[in-house]
Regions:
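PLP-dependent enzyme catalytic core of the Aspartate aminotransferase-like
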Residues: 53-57, 223-224, 235-241, 246-288
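Conserved glycine-rich beta-strand-loop-beta hairpin in the small C-terminal domain of fold type I
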Residues: 170, 174, 190-199, 204-218, ...
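Phosphate-binding glycine-rich loop
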Residues: 1-14
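Conserved core segment of the aminotransferase class I/II
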Residues: 122-192, 277
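Hydrophobic residues in well-ordered beta-strands that form the structural core
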Residues: 17, 38, 67, 98-100, ...
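Helix C-cap/helix->beta junction micro-motif
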Residues: 32, 93-94, 236
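A short helix-loop-beta submotif of the ANL/AMP-binding
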Residues: 31-37
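Active-site phosphate-binding strand-loop segment of PLP-dependent enzymes
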Residues: 42-110
Length: 288
């Protein structure tokens, strides 16, 4: 994503970012003197016409791209094909690039993943990741699919930024491609189950995809605000990410990753968080 932003975004260029978003995208745009324009979306807009109106409201003559994440990090929302077709048409009409973050494409539990790339191949850059698909975050291997000329420019940026992905990681990625389908299928079912259980404990709808839950904890915030809430969670042995890192409108929210630990340990952390949020969650009975 660093390479794709550096390839096309110049100083002063604006990028529409559907929020809440992956925490690093805003900073990447800013790193190259671009202007991230947040569009509060995934948690509140469920009508397509309203979505298009929100984009029109925030676009300007400096806007060059629209960043879309589906399945969404951090909400777990999966956008349907007709919404993506409408976004593609919006991008054509407004002459924008589409930056399509699809790193959780293999982890859809309800509905189906639809890629933006086939809908607007001439103006879409799709980002994919072995880190998420195959549990290989430490290997730092991913790829993008883009129009040929655009990809050639991104390759130049990559060469002069990190030169190339580490060879051991590339070999591991090749092995994953050759024999990782069963692992993905098994992991998807495990993630689906733990995500649904975590959501139920927190009184939330089960996520449609990704590996996150995004929670409004405003009712639990006292005089110390979110910082105090995070400190209390830490004392409980639970780490969650502050929602403000995913958008300016989300200062009273937190992001939970329910796959950061084995399922039973993750669910115990969720139980502690649920109790911190005022939910009546009894402890798990000890085995006799």
């Amino acid at each position: 994503i660093h390479c794709l932003i550096r390839t096309y975004v110049e100083a002063g260029d604006e990028v529409l970012i559907l929020a809440p978003f992956w925490p690093l995208i805003r900073g990447i745009v800013q790193a190259f003197r671009g202007v991230p324009v947040e569009v509060p979306f995934y948690d509140r807009i469920f009508d397509l016409e309203e979505a298009l109106a929100a984009l029109e409201e925030r676009i300007s003559e400096r806007t060059v791209a629209l960043y879309v994440s589906t399945p969404s990090n951090p909400t777990g929302r999966v956008l349907p094909g007709d919404w993506l077709e409408a976004f593609a048409e919006f991008a054509r009409r407004r002459d924008l690039w589409l930056l399509s973050d699809e790193v959780y494409e293999d982890y859809v539990y309800r509905g189906e993943h639809v890629s933006l790339a086939p809908l607007a191949p001439e103006r879409t850059v799709a980002v994919h990741s072995f880190s998420k698909a195959y549990g290989m975050a430490g290997n730092r291997v991913g790829y993008l699919a883009a129009p040929r000329e655009w990809a050639a420019q991104a390759r130049k940026i990559a060469t002069h930024t990190f030169y190339g992905a580490p060879t051991p990681g590339q070999w591991a990625a090749l092995r994953a491609l050759e024999g990782g389908a069963a692992w993905i299928a098994e992991s998807r079912e495990a993630y689906r189950e733990v995500g649904a259980q975590a959501a139920a404990l927190l009184g939330q709808e089960a996520p449609a995809g990704s590996t996150f839950l995004f929670l409004d904890v405003s009712a639990q915030l006292g005089a110390r605000g979110l910082e105090g809430f995070l400190a209390d969670c830490f004392e409980d042995g639970v780490l969650v990410a502050p929602g403000a890192s995913s958008g300016q409108d989300y200062g009273d929210w937190v992001r939970l990753c329910y796959t950061a630990l084995p399922p039973e340990k993750a669910l115990e952390a969720v139980r502690r968080l649920a109790r911190r949020c005022g939910r009546d969650v009894p402890p798990v009975a000890a085995e006799s």
